[in-house]
Amino acid sequence: MINTNPKRSNEPPVWLLFSAGGMISALAFPVLILILGILLPLGIISPDGIIAFAHHWFGKLVILVLTIFPAWAGLHRIHHGMHDIKVHVPSGGLIFYGLAVLYTVVAIWGVASI
């Protein structure tokens, strides 16, 4: 018999944000460490170029992508990691994903004010 009222899950959109954050972290953070941690202190790259990039609309988009998606990945990992170690927080999904949404809003506001 076919269930005409299937239960919907919020997991697919959350897994999309989680996987995007993991991929961005793996690919972009080594480059950021190279640029901000090595090339900038050695004087190979000027801070003026980085500031100009951050003020451009594309730079703001890059900053948002590099902050929002890894935050979703981290909070998703914490949420599921707590389940793995048998620490069940009441309304854990609401708390952790709510924090991710709050962080997203704060990040958008912060980057928009640059």
UniProtKB/Swiss-Prot annotation:
It is found in: Cell inner membrane. Its main location: membrane. GO terms for cellular component: fumarate reductase complex; plasma membrane. GO terms for molecular function: succinate dehydrogenase activity. The keyword Methyltransferase does not apply. It is a multi-pass membrane protein. The keyword Phosphoprotein does not apply. Keywords: Cell inner membrane, Cell membrane, Membrane, Transmembrane, Transmembrane helix. SUPFAM superfamilies: Fumarate reductase respiratory complex transmembrane subunits. One of its GO terms (biological process) is fumarate metabolic process. Belongs to the FrdD family. Part of an enzyme complex containing four subunits: a flavoprotein (FrdA), an iron-sulfur protein (FrdB), and two hydrophobic anchor proteins (FrdC and FrdD). Anchors the catalytic components of the fumarate reductase complex to the cell membrane, binds quinones. This is Fumarate reductase subunit D. It comes from Actinobacillus succinogenes (strain ATCC 55618 / DSM 22257 / CCUG 43843 / 130Z). The lineage of its organism: Bacteria, Pseudomonadati, Pseudomonadota, Gammaproteobacteria, Pasteurellales.
